Amino acid sequence: MEALVYAVSWAPGRTSHPDTPPNIYEGGLGAQQKQCPSAQGSKPKNFRLRHLRGLALYLPGHLQPAGQCESHWLGRLLAGGCLPQPEGLVWPLDLAQGTVGRGNSHHSALLEAQLPRDSRGNTASSSSMDPAKGAPSQSGPPEGLGLRPKRSWGAPEETTCPLCKRTRSGGLERL
């Protein structure tokens, strides 16, 4: 009976018994941290956010929204939202702006440097002559660059996904 009274006396004011470790979802290993009221009920979300708090170290100070709880802006980042990009700031990997393929881009210069060259320094193309055979060779770009080979004008061949056996247009592979 005395143990029951002792346990009930802890219930209203305390979140845990003094002999039990603090809740690992809310800071873990002795760290009692304040949270904003809207984030208290979702422990799995807080568990993920606890592991992502180090993300704040990599964000510049002006990207962290001022006056908001950490779990709010990290939660919005996890949910697929984005933090506002200040004007005039360029992201380090801004490939969506079409930098690859422009003539003045260092990416296209890098790709150009990796193409095979003949004895005169020209890059190989599908219309070049193969000196060993004396016939036009059909050499494409090296496989390691991630570039697709040129498509032939023959019968249309669509590649299929090895997992679902569907073509890019959505039809099933004919067996």
UniProtKB/Swiss-Prot annotation:
Organism, as annotated: Bos taurus (Bovine)
UniProt protein name: Uncharacterized protein C16orf90 homolog
Origin superkingdom: Eukaryota
InterPro entries linked to this entry: DUF4644
Region spans: Disordered: 113-175
PANTHER family attached to this UniProt entry: RGD1561796
Organism lineage: Eukaryota, Metazoa, Chordata, Craniata, Vertebrata
